[in-house]
């Protein structure tokens, strides 16, 4: 098994605390509403949303995968940090054991925030992660972020 680490950052004009509430804590409800072209539904399979919770994320037609199952690994309300692992479905299978993801939302001096994202692809055997997988994951994250950001800008009273 190998581990391929990929780090990226994305900026937002939304303050860190507000973005954490919307994007992380209520993303299960918000994503299908604001980005139905990316996520059709999120279903809680097991748990209460904290560490150990298993969620099934279903994708609409046009996305190469029908679903993924993810496990919440950490929710840090103080430091705006969220960790989860994709453990089934999607790209996980013959070549990938799991994908561990960590998102940390950091406040910026101008009142916005930076999302620091660390993805660890745990491969099976000597398989390598394809550049297309990383690109697709980054594009999905960017789509969700911009959709949530647009929603929050249009609804100034939401998630305060």
From Swiss-Prot:
It is found in: Cytoplasm. One of its GO terms (cellular component) is cytoplasm. InterPro entries: Bet_v_I/MLP (IPR000916), Bet_v_I_allergen (IPR024949), Plant_def-hormone_signal (IPR050279), START-like_dom_sf (IPR023393). Signal peptide: none annotated. The keyword Cytoplasm applies. Brassinolide binds at residues 55, 82, 84, 101. GO terms for molecular function: abscisic acid binding; protein phosphatase inhibitor activity; signaling receptor activity. Its main location: cytoplasm. SMART domains: Bet_v_1 (SM01037). Keywords: Allergen, Cytoplasm, Pathogenesis-related protein, Plant defense. CDD domains: Bet_v1-like. GO terms for biological process: abscisic acid-activated signaling pathway; defense response. The keyword Endoplasmic reticulum does not apply. Disulfide bonds: none annotated. Pfam families: Bet_v_1. May be a general steroid carrier protein. Belongs to the BetVI family. This is Major pollen allergen Bet v 1-E. It comes from Betula pendula. The lineage of its organism: Eukaryota, Viridiplantae, Streptophyta, Embryophyta, Tracheophyta. The gene is BETV1E.
């Amino acid at each position: 098994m190998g581990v391929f680490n990929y780090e990226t950052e994305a900026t937002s004009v939304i303050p860190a605390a507000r973005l954490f509430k919307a994007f992380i804590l209520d993303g299960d409800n918000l994503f299908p509403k604001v980005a139905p072209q990316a996520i059709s539904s999120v279903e809680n399979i097991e748990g209460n949303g904290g560490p150990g919770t298993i969620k099934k994320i279903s994708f609409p037609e046009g996305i190469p995968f029908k679903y993924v199952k993810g496990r919440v690994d950490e929710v840090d309300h103080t430091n705006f940090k969220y960790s989860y692992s994709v453990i089934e479905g999607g790209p996980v299978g013959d070549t990938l054991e799991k994908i561990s993801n960590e998102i940390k939302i950091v406040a910026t001096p101008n009142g916005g925030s930076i999302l620091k994202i660390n993805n660890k692809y745990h491969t099976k055997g000597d398989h390598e992660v394809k550049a297309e997988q990383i690109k697709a994951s980054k594009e999905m994250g960017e789509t969700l972020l911009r959709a949530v950001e647009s929603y929050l800008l249009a609804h100034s009273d939401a998630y305060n």
